[in-house]
Amino acid sequence: MDKDSKVVIIGAGVFGLSTAVQLAIEGFKNVVVVDRHMPPVPDGSSCDISRVIRFDYADEDYLNVSYEAYLKWSKDPKFKDIFHPSSYILTGSMTGGDESWIDRTTRQLSNKGLAWTKLDDAATAKSAFPILSGKLAEPGFKGYYNDAAGWADATKAIIQLRDECLELGVSFISGPAGTVVGFDTDSENKIRSVQTLGGISIQGDHFVLAAGAWSSNLVPMYNSTLATAQVIAYTPLSDTEVQRYKKLPIYANFNTGWFNFPPHADTKTLKMAVHGRGYTRTPSKGEALIEANISTPRVYPSCERPNLCPSEGEGRLRNGLREILPELADRPFEKVTMCWHTDTPSGDFIMDYHPDYQNLFVGGAGSGQ
């Protein structure tokens, strides 16, 4: 690619911004990021108080990439106020169907010479982490923990990426002028420009679609992805409780999909979520560019995630909290909401050129990973 060519990136989340930074570092002089909102985009899946940083994967390639990322998060001084080390427990019940997944993960860790500690039962887990007061994943408990893990303050990370983009000369277009509603193509299905809600055309030589769950609004994904909303809750904590639970590990139950974070000191909340099949939403008529049976979040207005989630989802959140900290399980949540994921059948990312457009590269499908 000619480094004087213009690259237009659709989406100002972690995929789009990190792509922009890398292109600028490699010498591309004309990189433009377009989105409905300047980052951090308030309803984007990259933005919130926390995201898990781990390298525990059953797939060797994902483990290698995520381990490299973990080393950068944990050792690079620029992440000192963003990355927070924490132990990570992966557990579940052997009565479920996913027992082999934990075995494959620990085997990959061992093959790479990375430490992990087996947890034979709930009592062993409580001995290692006395703050866990619930019954945990019983009966048939199976699990392990890894001390080389942690979490990142996601919104702070996005702000840092945005500022790095600006320092490197990346341009941003937001608001109606940055809300993409269509493409102008030539006779060979090569995109010449994107059309926006504000009525302007943004020309480019190369285009990157990194719009997360909104991507299927713009191009057909041919059943390769499904946008799903996952439930999240935040329990308020007192100053004393923030200190009491500060050594709480990240605990993930692979049977239920429930997981938590340690307390977030800035907001004085304990965050938890469920990563499962999620909820879908059918767009209203005319909302999506693609006339197909798709699931998608609202396109506009771009706004903070609403304080609501299905009652069934709230029940799963409380059940998971009761599993590890029953003393907090009936406390009113400060907020419940939903985060939109782009899931693939295999849980793999998609990084490839779109089959319908010569110069459109699709990056994303994070699948909640």
Which residues are covered by each model-predicted region?
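Core beta-strand elements of the Rossmann-like FAD/NAD(P) dinucleotide-binding domain
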Residues: 3-5, 196-206
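Dinucleotide-binding Rossmann-like beta1-alpha1 core, especially the glycine-rich loop
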Residues: 50-131
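Glycine-rich FAD pyrophosphate-binding loop
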Residues: 24-45
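Flavin (FAD/FMN) cofactor-binding and adjacent substrate-gating region
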Residues: 95-175, 181-190
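Conserved Rossmann-like nucleotide-cofactor binding loop
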Residues: 15, 39, 214
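Active-site substrate-recognition segment that forms the wall
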Residues: 21-26, 81-85, 201-206, 213-359
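Beta1/beta-strand and adjacent pyrophosphate-binding region of the FAD-binding site
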Residues: 2-15, 32
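Glycine-rich phosphate/pyrophosphate-binding beta-alpha loops
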Residues: 58, 149-151, 340-342, 360-369
